[in-house]
């Protein structure tokens, strides 16, 4: 009798253990089929190592890249990185180092920018051996000046942040436990104990918790919606921002992939770099695998219960391992990753956003007589832009400089900016 009881207990434990192991494999996408898919091409490789986060100013046409030369995660040594500026109207896409005069240890992770008047506030997560910090900079033109370093016990395991203005922001902590069995439980069992913290310029307060590996975060100003990536649960969590900056949970979006950083296009569609297999990513991050698969998705979020998810890119990691961010611009996608020696500028055959004003608003005030619009290869007057039905637009491209523009038109003069529009056939 006792022997039978012990056997039942033993087999029950084995069954529970098998269920736990199976859950780990299933919930992390281990069995997911990876198929190389992208309707487009690689426009350029930008030689910046570990370009983990990228954000774009759609109005001023530049990208800020946060990069750290990682060898494996976690690291035992101080890593080195920087912030970079890329002019998106210059088709050479030459990165400019912004932080070469920043003398503190600097291994940036998530970043955010906020424009006020003619300057930008740039905030960056900074991982150092002395602790976790948030660095605040001011960007004027292409000159970045460090303003202050923020340190607090609530900045515990910071991953990403989003600025509301030059002083206030939300940020994510991706873990509650730094090490030990509970840290492993967060990674492998999906223990949901990470959080979102709000900083009002003076005080820190937790505004959301119970998240499995809180990662990328972004804020839709018009709708007052905060989006938080939970890659361990394959979710994007949606919150309503209240007047007092507390958050009200709305719903989870099941993305079926390990969502990472969140960016917006001009129509506030979410663009997300993602890890379709978290176990493969974990092995890659630790140095046990040479590559890990990459995925890019976009989410058109309308309201609670009404949204669509579209896969834009997937591959096995041979071209780009472990994609973390997908920042859209026109029909380009700036796709960053964890540890590759370069990030990719992808050119989609699809128009990513069908709004044209973001181009005209930037160019026209500063180049009143130096803008050329081409519609299907023929010059078009600016006032005729509004006559083009958005649904008929296939692509929009921006070219700057006499050399580039001469490929498309006989008008060859310095300072010209050409906006080429192609319609659906």
Stretches found by the model and what they are:
Residues 65-79, 125, 171-191, 272-293, ...:
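Short, conserved, GDST-rich strand-edge loop motifs in beta-rich repeat architectures
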Residues 103-110, 114-165, 172-179:
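Asp-box/WD-like beta-propeller blade repeats and closely related beta-sheet repeat scaffolds
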Residues 43-81, 339:
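Beta-strand-rich domains and repeat architectures in extracellular enzymes and scaffolds
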Residues 70, 78-125:
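Blade-loop segments of beta-propeller domains
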């Amino acid at each position: 009798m006792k022997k039978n009881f012990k056997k039942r207990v033993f087999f029950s434990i084995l069954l529970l253990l098998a269920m736990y192991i199976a859950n780990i494999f299933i919930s992390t996408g281990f069995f997911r089929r990876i198929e190389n898919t992208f309707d487009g091409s690689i426009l350029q490789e930008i030689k910046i190592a570990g370009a983990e986060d990228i954000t774009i100013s759609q109005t001023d046409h530049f990208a800020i890249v946060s990069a750290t030369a990682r060898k494996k995660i976690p690291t035992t040594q101080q890593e080195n990185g920087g912030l970079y500026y890329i002019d998106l109207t210059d088709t050479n896409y030459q990165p400019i180092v912004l932080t070469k005069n920043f003398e503190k240890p600097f291994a940036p992770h998530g970043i955010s920018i906020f424009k006020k008047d003619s300057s930008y506030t740039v905030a960056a997560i900074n991982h150092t051996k002395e602790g976790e910090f948030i660095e605040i900079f001011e960007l004027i033109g292409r000159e970045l000046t460090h303003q202050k370093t923020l340190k607090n016990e609530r900045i515990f395991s910071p991953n990403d942040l989003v600025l509301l203005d030059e002083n206030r922001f939300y940020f994510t902590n991706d873990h509650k436990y730094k090490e030990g069995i509970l840290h492993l439980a967060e990674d492998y069992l999906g223990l949901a104990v990470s959080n979102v913290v709000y900083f009002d310029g003076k005080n820190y307060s937790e505004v959301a918790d119970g998240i499995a590996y809180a990662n990328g975060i972004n804020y839709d100003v018009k709708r007052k919606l905060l989006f938080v990536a939970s890659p361990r649960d394959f979710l994007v969590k949606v919150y309503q921002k209240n007047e007092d900056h507390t958050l009200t949970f709305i719903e989870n979006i099941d993305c079926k992939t390990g969502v990472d950083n969140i960016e917006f296009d001009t129509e506030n569609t979410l663009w997300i770099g993602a890890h379709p297999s978290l176990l493969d990513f974990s092995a890659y991050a630790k140095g046990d695998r040479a590559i890990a698969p990459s995925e890019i998705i976009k989410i058109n979020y309308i309201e609670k219960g009404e949204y669509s998810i579209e896969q834009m890119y997937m591959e096995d990691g041979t071209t780009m391992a472990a994609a973390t961010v997908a920042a859209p611009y026109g029909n380009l996608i700036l796709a960053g990753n964890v540890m590759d020696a370069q990030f990719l500028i992808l050119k989609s055959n699809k128009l990513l956003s069908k709004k044209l004003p973001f181009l005209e608003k930037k160019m026209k005030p500063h180049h009143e007589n130096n803008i050329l619009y081409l519609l299907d290869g023929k010059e078009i007057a600016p006032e005729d832009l509004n006559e083009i039905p958005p649904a008929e637009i296939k692509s929009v491209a921006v070219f700057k400089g006499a050399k580039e523009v001469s490929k498309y038109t006989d008008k060859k003069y310095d300072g010209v900016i050409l906006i080429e529009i192609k319609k659906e056939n």
